[in-house]
């Protein structure tokens, strides 16, 4: 066997081994709304915004109904943020500050059972693209 064949075979074996190890290694942990992506204070401010601006068209509970959860579960959080920030409030779309939209979104997440965390929800579409909406099914009240 020539040295070239031996080295080529060893290289192929090494590449296959490395590919197998890389495939088995855990990747970066996915960030979801179940990871605590907003603060309790941020959600409280979002509730104030919701109750003063949004509730006239969207009664309390609108954003925690089964149809809402089914539509958004698994989607990037940036999609919901973009929808809110470009179309709401209905009479004056896109008139709130980005932080106000993020606060309102934090409130919506809280209402859907997502836990609060230590860092505020960012008001950036780019950052929110990294977060998936995870809304576990609500269990009916006894």
Question: Which residues make up each language-model segment?
Answer:
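Positively charged n-region of N-terminal signal peptides that target proteins for export
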Residues: 1-5
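Bacterial N-terminal signal peptides
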Residues: 9-20
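Electrostatic cytochrome c docking/interface patches
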Residues: 24-49, 92
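Electron-transfer interface patches adjacent to heme c in soluble/periplasmic c-type cytochromes
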Residues: 40-41, 67-82, 89-102, 120, ...
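The canonical Cys-X-X-Cys-His
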Residues: 46, 50-60, 104, 108
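Short, non-ligating residues that shape and space the ligands of small metal-coordination modules
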Residues: 63-64
